[in-house]
A protein has these predicted regions:
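Pre-Walker A adenine-sensing motif
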Residues: 6-18
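Phosphate-binding/switch loop-helix module in NTP-utilizing enzymes
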Residues: 91-159
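Conserved P-loop
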Residues: 30-101
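Conserved nucleotide-binding/hydrolysis micro-motifs of P-loop NTPases
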Residues: 59-63, 88-92, 135-137, 171-175, ...
Length: 222
C-alpha cells in the first residue's frame, strides 16, 4: 500500500510511513493545537515531492496561506502548486478568483472542486494532496446533515482521483455524535492537544494500519 508522508517523522513512523494514498483523515484538536500548521506542512511535503496540492480554506484567503507558509520557509512551489478553493472571501463581500465560492452553497463548492481537479488534470496515478481547513465552518454555516452529505461526496471524490486528504475539525465545539459521524465518514483520525508541556499528536485510528495509541510530542519548526 502506498503511503504519503505527513512531514512529521515521529508520526509517520507510527503509521507505517504515512497516510494511505486516496484516504481522507480527520485532524481533531482544540484551538492552538497546531491543526492548521500541520495541514500546511502536509501540503509543503507534497510540494517538495513535486505534486499539485489543494486547500479548501474557510478561514483565510490565499495570500494569508502563502504568508504563513513563508514564515516557516515553506515557499518552494507555493504560487504554482498550492491551489486554493476560497470559501472565505465571500464573508467579506468579495470574490478574489474564479475559485472563490460561498460556503453556504455546497453545490458551488462541489462544482468548483471538480473544476480545480479538471483544470490541473488530476488523475488517480498521481499523489496529489488536499486539506480542508476547517470543516467546523461547514457545520456552522450549513448544518450537520448537509455537511456530512458533502463529506461523503468529498471522500468519494478523493478516492476516485487518488488524492489524499486532511479534514480539520475543532474539538470542544461539536456534539459527540457529530464527531462520531465525521469519524465514520473518514478513514482515520489524528488527535492533537496542547498543554504547558508542549504540543502533542496521536493517530487514534487509520485505515489498514495497526496502531499503538501513544501521544507524540512534536514541534513544527522552520
Amino acid at each position: 500500500m502506498q503511503r504519503l508522508s505527513l512531514g512529521v517523522p515521529e508520526l509517520d513512523q507510527a503509521i507505517l510511513g504515512g497516510i494511505p494514498k486516496g484516504s481522507l483523515v480527520l485532524v481533531l484538536g482544540p484551538p492552538g493545537a497546531g491543526k492548521s500548521i500541520l495541514g500546511k506542512l502536509f501540503l509543503h511535503t507534497g510540494l517538495v515531492a513535486g505534486v499539485q496540492t489543494f486547500m479548501v480554506s474557510t478561514a483565510e484567503a490565499d495570500q494569508a496561506i502563502a504568508e504563513t507558509m513563508a514564515m516557516f520557509r515553506w515557499t518552494a512551489g507555493v504560487p504554482e502548486r498550492v491551489h486554493v478553493l476560497d470559501c472565505y472571501s465571500w464573508r467579506l463581500g468579495g470574490k478574489r478568483s474564479k475559485y472563490s465560492v460561498p460556503l453556504t452553497s455546497l453545490t458551488e463548492v462541489s462544482v468548483s472542486l471538480s473544476k480545480l481537479f479538471d483544470d490541473y488534470k488530476i488523475h488517480p496515478e498521481g499523489n496529489e494532496r488536499l486539506v480542508v481547513d476547517s470543516f467546523t465552518d461547514f457545520v456552522k454555516y450549513v448544518g450537520v446533515d448537509k455537511s456530512l452529505k458533502f463529506l461523503d461526496y468529498l471522500r468519494q471524490k478523493l478516492r476516485e482521483n487518488g488524492v489524499t486528504g486532511m479534514l480539520m475539525l475543532e474539538e470542544g465545539v461539536h456534539a459527540p455524535r457529530t464527531i462520531a459521524a465525521v469519524e465514520y465518514s473518514t478513514d482515520g483520525t489524528i488527535r492533537m492537544k496542547v498543554s504547558e508541556q508542549g504540543r502533542f499528536m496521536m493517530a487514534s485510528r487509520m485505515q489498514a494500519t495497526p496502531l499503538a495509541q501513544k501521544w507524540i510530542q512534536f514541534t513544527i519548526g522552520k
